[in-house]
């Protein structure tokens, strides 16, 4: 694939252990039937290396970013939770070459197709000799006001105004951030993206009922699996990949090809996370189901309980900070759970719309909602959480994630309804730039080596690179 697929080789393969050559996801050629329609949901997690499910039992839970450390998260925890088989052939959608104005279309990596490695001179990639931080076309307008939207003519590769255009000629407007690949195959909103440890495969699942497995060496889709049901969520934890389905959670180990059906699920699973040796799954009914990892190879996950005092509506998101699990819901509340006792400590009720995403940073909780607000919560003297800052957006907010920039400063990505993603400094909430998509981005996942994966409601899966970026 030439230099266009180098993101796979240079960053992922350097950071992810090569897997043994095992069969991939045999579990999903399953005799599984489910109701056709369920409402959408989303969430994702990030993996840590483990040999067996029993290893999850002994590891420490996620923890928020600690300002007392030099760079990055608590090294003893895995604080990375910031918190149809018809495919379009790229042969008929090849990017136009326009040296003056650039092309909006990045390399399209499809299922079983290869795209010729043509010279690129555009605002997405820049010339061959340029770095991935090219943001040409992101400068100010002639009157000094910033450009706030992408040029529709540039998207089609035929804007004649060049640098004088009042609209952006780039998919991103942030120093060092560039889109490096577009993976094509999904036809509906992407519910989860996972890059499990011990594997050289990227997993993505969509509301179109397909699970796609991508090879990190070539960037090609190596397998498409018809789930025969609408998926609700996808996460990875260690070598395990977990898939939330109607009335089911499926688990697959990429190291030994073991697949497991987790019992006890009633309703569509919209959100999952793992911490303290346990897997948590939030359903459409508002219940939160818990499985405990065991040292049994035949039964690696044992159903433990359903958390009492659960939400009155669909659980949409999770995040873990220290010894606490936070859950958000369409009932507009955030519940705070003790990971040791599995009891609800408190319920937060400041949002007036669905809580869409949760993020732990420093000793604070950050939440977003369809009400268009981002709230920063901090502990008060009586150990309750109170809102200390609210940022009001013009549009509904759909997902949050965080990482460090090239200067090791924490930044937050915030997805809006119009397809834009705001990039903010923490803790000031000052907006530093944006990245863009054609539809609302509903999934953001941080990868190794400064990679960021985004999935939108039209099925576009894009790979971004932030120069010298690290996970928060």
From Swiss-Prot:
Keywords (A to Z) from UniProt: DNA-binding, Metal-binding, Repeat, WD repeat, Zinc, Zinc-finger
Transmembrane segments: none
One example GO MF annotation: DNA binding
ZnF start-end (C3H1-type): 145-172
Record's keyword annotation contains Zinc-finger: yes
Gene Ontology CC: one annotated term: nucleus
rRNA-binding keyword on record: no
SUPFAM superfamilies: CCCH zinc finger (SSF90229), WD40 repeat-like (SSF50978)
Repeat positions for WD: 185-226, 261-301, 310-347, 350-387, 436-472
Cross-referenced PROSITE patterns: WD_REPEATS_1 (PS00678), WD_REPEATS_2 (PS50082), WD_REPEATS_REGION (PS50294), ZF_C3H1 (PS50103)
Disordered: region residues: 87-139
UniProt-recorded name of the protein: Zinc finger CCCH domain-containing protein 59
């Amino acid at each position: 694939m030439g230099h266009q697929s180098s993101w796979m080789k240079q960053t992922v393969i350097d950071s992810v252990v090569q897997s043994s050559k095992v069969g991939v996801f045999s579990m999903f050629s399953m005799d599984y039937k489910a109701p056709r329609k369920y409402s959408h949901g989303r969430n994702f997690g990030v993996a840590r290396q483990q040999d067996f499910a029993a290893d999850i039992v002994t590891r420490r839970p996620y923890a928020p970013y600690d300002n007392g450390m030099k760079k990055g998260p608590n090294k003893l925890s895995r604080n990375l939770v910031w918190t149809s088989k018809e495919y379009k052939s790229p042969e008929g959608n090849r990017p136009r070459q326009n040296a003056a104005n650039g092309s909006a279309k990045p390399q399209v990596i499809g299922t079983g197709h290869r795209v010729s490695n043509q010279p690129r001179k555009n605002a997405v990639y820049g010339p061959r000799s340029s770095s991935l931080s090219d943001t040409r076309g992101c400068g100010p307008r002639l009157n000094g006001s910033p450009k706030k939207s992408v040029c529709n003519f540039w998207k089609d590769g035929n804007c004649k105004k060049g640098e004088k255009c009042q609209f952006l000629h780039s998919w991103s407007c942030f120093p060092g951030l560039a889109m490096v690949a577009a993976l094509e195959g999904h036809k509906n909103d992407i519910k989860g993206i996972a890059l499990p440890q011990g594997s050289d495969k990227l997993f993505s699942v969509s509301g179109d009922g397909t699970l796609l497995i991508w090879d990190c060496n070539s960037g090609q889709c190596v397998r498409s699996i018809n789930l025969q049901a609408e998926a609700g969520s996808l996460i990875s934890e260690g070598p395990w990949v977990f898939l939330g389905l109607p009335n089911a959670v499926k688990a697959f180990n990429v190291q030994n090809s073991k697949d497991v059906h987790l019992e006890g699920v009633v309703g569509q699973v919209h959100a999952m996370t793992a911490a303290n040796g346990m897997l948590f799954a939030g359903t459409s009914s508002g219940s939160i189901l818990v499985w405990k990892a065991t040292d049994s190879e035949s039964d690696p996950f044992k159903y433990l309980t359903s958390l009492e005092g659960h939400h009155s509506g669909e659980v949409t998101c999770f995040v873990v900070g220290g010894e606490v699990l936070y859950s958000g819901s369409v009932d507009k509340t955030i519940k705070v759970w003790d990971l040791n006792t599995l009891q609800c400590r408190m319920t937060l009720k400041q949002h007036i719309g669905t809580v869409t995403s949760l993020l732990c940073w420093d000793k604070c909780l950050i939440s977003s909602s369809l009400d268009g607000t981002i709230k920063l919560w901090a502990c008060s003297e009586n150990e309750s959480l109170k809102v200390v800052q609210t940022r009001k957006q013009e549009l509904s907010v759909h997902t949050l994630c965080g990482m460090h920039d090239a200067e090791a400063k924490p930044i937050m990505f915030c997805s809006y309804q119009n397809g834009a993603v705001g990039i903010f400094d923490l803790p000031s909430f000052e907006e530093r730039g944006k990245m863009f998509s054609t539809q609302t981005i509903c999934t953001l996942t941080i990868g190794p080596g400064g990679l960021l994966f985004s999935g939108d409601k039209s099925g576009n899966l894009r790979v971004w690179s932030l120069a010298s970026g690290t996970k928060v």
